[in-house]
Amino acid sequence: MSRYRGPRFKKIRRLGALPGLTSKRPSPGSDLRNQSRSGKRSQYRIRLEEKQKLRFHYGLTERQLLRYVRIAGKAKGSTGQVLLQLLEMRLDNILFRLGMASTIPGARQLVNHRHILVNGRIVDIPSYRCKPQDIITTRDEQRSRALIQKSIDSSPHEEVPKHLTLYPFQYKALVNKIIDSQWIGLKINELLVVEYYSRQT
């Protein structure tokens, strides 16, 4: 299944706010999750919607998300928590959380177009997994810096999560540590996502 490129407002009406996909928010009363035709949602549908929230927020294909679930399942600790940490430490997501891009698709474009360096080297893989002490900078070119500055200026000025430090005047950021669960950028029940995939096998 390919990455979603359809109408974004349709998805947030169905699933609720997805800040990684779009800065828009569903208007009060427009949330279709509470307007199921059958009245009460089935447990399967609840798990499916949580999985879809995760997938659309982080801009993943079905295959990519399944791969992350499998990696998390083999790691020590809670599978759901490890899954969220893996997704949050992706380069495209970190650029979004820093305010260097207004959405994760926008951050992905910055990376794909080679505007971003990690530890002094150009990285053009949006899924690159950032590590503590990684230094993220923009290319020393006017266009690269102009794109970043535009995003920083237009960002809603939300607090940068504690695992990151942004130096906006230097177009630079530091990854301090692996993200803690309370700083995850999405309201999600990750256990339902893990349950969804465990019931598919």
UniProtKB/Swiss-Prot annotation:
Localization, UniProt: Plastid, Chloroplast
Similarity remark: Belongs to the universal ribosomal protein uS4 family.
Ranges for domain S4 RNA-binding: 89-150
UniProt key word Ion transport: no
UniProt keyword annotations, A-Z: Chloroplast, Plastid, Ribonucleoprotein, Ribosomal protein, RNA-binding, rRNA-binding
SUPFAM superfamilies: Alpha-L RNA-binding motif (SSF55174)
Gene: rps4
Main location: plastid
PANTHER family the record matches: 30S 40S RIBOSOMAL PROTEIN (PTHR11831), SMALL RIBOSOMAL SUBUNIT PROTEIN US4M (PTHR11831:SF4)
Segments of this protein annotated with the region Disordered: 15-43
Listed SMART domains: Ribosomal_S4, S4
Any single biological process term in GO: ribosomal small subunit biogenesis
MF (Gene Ontology): rRNA binding; structural constituent of ribosome
PROSITE patterns: RIBOSOMAL_S4, S4
Assembly behavior: Part of the 30S ribosomal subunit. Contacts protein S5. The interaction surface between S4 and S5 is involved in control of translational fidelity.
Protein's UniProt name: Small ribosomal subunit protein uS4c
Function noted in UniProt: One of the primary rRNA binding proteins, it binds directly to 16S rRNA where it nucleates assembly of the body of the 30S subunit. With S5 and S12 plays an important role in translational accuracy.
InterPro entries: Ribosomal_uS4, Ribosomal_uS4_bac-type, Ribosomal_uS4_CS, Ribosomal_uS4_N, S4_RNA-bd, S4_RNA-bd_sf
GO CC terms of this entry: chloroplast; small ribosomal subunit
